[in-house]
Amino acid sequence: NWNDTYMVTANMRADGSSKLAPHHRWGYFPSAAAAWRISSEPFMKGTKKWLDDLKLRVSFGTAGNNNIPVGQLTQEYQAVTGDPTLWVNGFNTMWAPSSTMANPNLKWETTITRNLGLDFTVFDGKLSGSVEGYINTTKDLLIKFPVSGTGYTSQYRNMGETENKGLEATLTWHAVNKKDWGIDFSGNIGFNK
């Protein structure tokens, strides 16, 4: 933070998960944000009568997801109850392979978020609002995929990508602001694709 005009923050997160393949076990997820209080600049002095605050902000961040059951890297076996009807190599057995096929190459599902926003306050704090645009992308989705014809029912895989983007706007009018009570009117609108 420099002179309450330029603000920057950054973060690095490292997550490890035994649910994922050894060569993909660690995920590194950086994030950063910056803001510029435009209203503090000398060239904005002519707006002081009506503009209280104007701030532009931008952010970028990543996050990981490993929300799958434990034991998807190697083939699991499950106990068979009742009279064993499963034969392996000519011998009946009380244990059967899990219906989910193992996948030794699973890695982190990663979500990337990008935001650009503008916040403002005008007329001695009577009116405030913000406008924000965003793009969110999720890569390497962890999906339980059907694998018919293999003897198994499904397998967890990293596949696919999703993206959503949108625009949001908020406006608040502080109609009454007394010592012990107040009245505010707020509205927002959003578009998402």
Language model regions located:
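Extracellular/periplasmic, surface-exposed regions of secreted and cell-surface proteins
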Residues: 1-193
